[in-house]
């Protein structure tokens, strides 16, 4: 019995590592899809919603690890949107967005993990709540970063974010649909995170 449980534990850890690595790579890949707009030059990109996709699919722990791995790789390689490093982003107006990932992912992931076994319509609605709440956290922390690094007041920081809201809202709807599709195809993927 001990051999079987230890081998199943090792297999679970191995698959967790694989999921984390795959989602870190996905977040990195989606960072190269960027269009600069707005007052502060912060780009519209898929990376902001991709980290929340990691939370919705993997849950709070593995989603956080995937996001952390992405940011760790970014210390050494230019994997953030626009070909920037994590260190560069921390010294720029985007500091709030980068730090927000570490808050938004666990929040969205906890909600997703708790509702994954709900009926499909309820799950879809609550996944949307989780995704948009994570996005709201990114916007609030992003605005704070803009206030400190771009010398904007609260109104200016809020105005700088306006061009991003429509596209981010659409992106998040797509990410929620993808997450629900993944959980439909792989119904046990998130269950161990909800325990």
Task: Identify the residue ranges that each predicted region occupies.
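Hydrophobic transmembrane alpha-helices
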Residues: 2-64
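Residue-level signature of transmembrane alpha-helical entry/exit and packing/kink sites
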Residues: 12-23, 44, 48-51, 63, ...
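Membrane-embedded alpha-helical hairpins and interfacial helices in multi-pass inner-membrane proteins
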Residues: 83-84, 117-194
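Short helix-perturbing small/polar motifs within transmembrane alpha-helices
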Residues: 3-7, 18-21, 29, 86-138
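Interfacial aromatic-anchored transmembrane helix boundaries in multi-pass membrane proteins
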Residues: 31-43, 71-104
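Helix-loop junctions at the membrane-solvent interface of multi-pass transporters
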Residues: 33, 57, 76, 84, ...
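Alpha-helical transmembrane segments in multi-pass membrane proteins
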Residues: 22-30, 51, 55, 66-74, ...
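Structural signal for the C-terminal ends of transmembrane alpha-helices
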Residues: 57-61, 107-116, 181-186
């Amino acid at each position: 019995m001990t051999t079987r449980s230890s081998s199943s534990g090792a297999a679970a850890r191995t698959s967790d590592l694989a999921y984390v690595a795959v989602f870190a790579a996905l977040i990195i890949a989606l960072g190269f899809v960027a269009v600069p707009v707005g007052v502060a030059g912060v780009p519209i990109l898929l990376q902001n919603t991709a980290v929340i996709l990691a939370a919705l699919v993997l849950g709070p722990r593995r989603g956080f690890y995937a996001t952390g791995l992405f940011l760790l790789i970014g210390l050494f390689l230019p994997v953030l949107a626009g070909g920037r490093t994590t260190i560069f982003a921390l010294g720029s107006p985007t500091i709030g967005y980068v730090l927000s990932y570490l808050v938004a992912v666990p929040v969205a992931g906890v909600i997703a993990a708790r509702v994954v076994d709900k009926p499909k319509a309820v799950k879809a609605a609550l996944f949307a709540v989780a995704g948009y709440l994570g996005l709201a956290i990114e916007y609030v922390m992003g605005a704070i970063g803009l206030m400190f690094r771009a010398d904007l007041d609260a109104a200016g920081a809020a105005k700088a974010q306006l061009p991003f809201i429509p596209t981010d809202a659409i992106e998040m709807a797509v990410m929620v649909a993808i997450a629900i599709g993944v959980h439909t195809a792989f119904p046990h993927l998130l269950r161990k995170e909800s325990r």
